[in-house]
């Protein structure tokens, strides 16, 4: 891979060496544990044959892969945009970093469309809301986004400027093929999914407004969920794509015009850093989108808190962090029956629990 010196634009990498790494450190600290928890909860939903869990699990996996690249980007910005880890790692981590943006947008779009079908056409498109269908759609998303964003892997992505800074996945001004690829990313990777999300939101609003059986509180929750999907994409990704489109359009109109690149350099880096907030917003979205997920997450957090605050950690570990089994479920059912005035005869293994009513107390 070549990394020769080129006479590019004069961009001052010192002006933004604090904000992006600070934001990335925050995302690592918050996004890593919350996405691990979301991944576990999504897996539980998939085991319950919930197709929504498939999309949420893939979203968590993409976020975790992205978070794993952030320590090297923190180091990159702290060294004033100077990549010191070699060309191979630049290609790999840059590829994961930028591809995650469009994988996340695609899965947010899948969630939005899935919710539209569930609310507006619960019976008509029931076959499209099966786990097998969600797995197939997720496979197509991964294959499409990985393939579409793999072009930089076949080009040089390390560039050394006149000040001996080695840029990774950045060149000012950009190259011609990069400008055209950016247009594809903006219109196909960002605007098209966002348009589908807007249409889904409109369809959800019409379906909810016309439903007489849905309670007002439930209608508000559905609207809030659909709007939160659109807001995540708009807040996290729109500023970056506005600047990406502007840089690409200016280059295609006036190649090697450094004035615009130098003016937007700091804003561009800040908008790129803002895309990482998606990894913090996604787990919050996960709790909003699924009632069972909220219950799973709340139960896990409660058990973890009890474990951390218990005087007997080993006892709490065995008592609080044990997953339900058929046997423990039976025991819990028996306990609830006794509390309600029922007595359960001790069941043998594989037998059903036999319940007998207590006789009324003697007068």
From Swiss-Prot:
InterPro entries to which the protein is assigned, alphabetical: GPCR_Rhodpsn (IPR000276), GPCR_Rhodpsn_7TM (IPR017452), GPR4_orph (IPR002276)
Activity control mechanisms: Activated by a network of residues that connects an extracellular-facing cavity to Glu-145, a conserved charged residue buried in the transmembrane core of the receptor. Protonation likely drives conformational changes in extracellular loop 2 (ECL2), which stabilizes movement of transmembrane 3 (TM3) and a series of rearrangements that connect the extracellular-facing cavity to Glu-145, a residue only conserved in proton-sensing G-protein coupled receptors.
Region (Extracellular loop 2 (ECL2)): 157-172
Extracellular face residues: 1-8, 81-85, 157-172, 251-260
Region described as Disordered: spans on this chain: 344-363
Cytoplasmic topological segments: 46-49, 122-129, 211-214, 290-363
Gene3D superfamilies noted in UniProt: Rhodopsin 7-helix transmembrane proteins
Subcellular location field: Cell membrane
GO molecular function: G protein-coupled receptor activity
Cellular component aspect of the GO annotation: plasma membrane
Primary localization: membrane
Transmembrane annotation, as ranges: 9-45, 50-80, 86-121, 130-156, 173-210, 215-250, 261-289
Disulfide links within the chain: 9-258, 90-168
Its biological purpose: Proton-sensing G-protein coupled receptor activated by extracellular pH, which is required to monitor pH changes and generate adaptive reactions. Activated by an optimal pH of 6.8-7.2. Ligand binding causes a conformation change that triggers signaling via guanine nucleotide-binding proteins (G proteins) and modulates the activity of downstream effectors, such as adenylate cyclase. GPR4 is mainly coupled to G(s) G proteins and mediates activation of adenylate cyclase activity. May also couple with G(q) and G(12)/G(13) G proteins.
Domain remark from Swiss-Prot or TrEMBL: A multitude of proton-sensing residues, which include extracellular histidine residues (His-155, His-165 and His-269) or triad of buried acidic residues (Asp-63, Glu-145 and Asp-282), contribute to activation of the G-protein coupled receptor activity and pH sensitivity.
Protein name: G-protein coupled receptor 4
Organism field: Sus scrofa
């Amino acid at each position: 891979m070549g990394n020769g010196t080129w006479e590019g634009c004069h961009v001052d990498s010192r002006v933004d060496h604090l904000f992006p790494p600070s934001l990335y450190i925050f995302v690592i600290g918050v996004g890593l544990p919350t996405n691990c928890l979301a991944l576990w909860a999504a897996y539980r939903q998939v085991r319950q044959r919930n197709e929504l869990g498939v999309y949420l699990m893939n979203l968590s996996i993409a976020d975790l892969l992205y978070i794993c690249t952030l320590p090297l980007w923190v180091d990159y910005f702290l060294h004033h945009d100077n990549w010191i880890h070699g060309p191979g790692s630049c290609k790999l981590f840059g590829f994961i970093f930028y591809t995650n943006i469009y994988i996340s947008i695609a899965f947010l779009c899948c969630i939005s469309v899935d919710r539209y079908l569930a609310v507006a056409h619960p019976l008509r498109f029931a076959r499209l809301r099966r786990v097998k269908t969600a797995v197939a759609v997720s496979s197509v998303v991964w294959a499409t986004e990985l393939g579409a964003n793999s072009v930089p892997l076949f080009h040089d992505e390390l560039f050394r400027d006149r000040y001996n800074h080695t840029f990774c996945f950045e060149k000012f001004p950009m190259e011609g093929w990069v400008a055209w690829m950016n247009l594809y990313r903006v219109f196909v990777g960002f605007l098209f999914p966002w348009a589908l999300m807007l249409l889904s939101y409109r369809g959800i609003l019409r379906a909810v407004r016309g439903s007489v059986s849905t309670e007002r509180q439930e209608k508000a929750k559905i609207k809030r969920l659909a709007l939160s999907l659109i807001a995540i994409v708009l807040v996290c990704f729109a500023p970056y794509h506005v600047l990406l489109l502007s840089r690409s359009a200016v280059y295609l109109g006036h190649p090697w015009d450094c004035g615009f690149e130098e003016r937007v350099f700091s804003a561009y880096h800040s908008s790129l850093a803002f895309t990482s907030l998606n990894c913090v917003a996604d787990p919050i979205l996960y709790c909003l989108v699924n009632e069972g997920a909220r219950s799973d997450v709340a139960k896990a957090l409660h058990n973890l808190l009890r474990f951390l605050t218990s005087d007997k950690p080993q006892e709490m570990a065995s008592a609080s962090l044990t997953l339900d089994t058929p046997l423990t479920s039976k025991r819990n059912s028996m306990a609830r029956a006794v509390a309600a005035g029922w007595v359960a005869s001790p069941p043998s293994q594989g037998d059903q629990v036999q319940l007998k009513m207590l006789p009324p107390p003697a007068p």
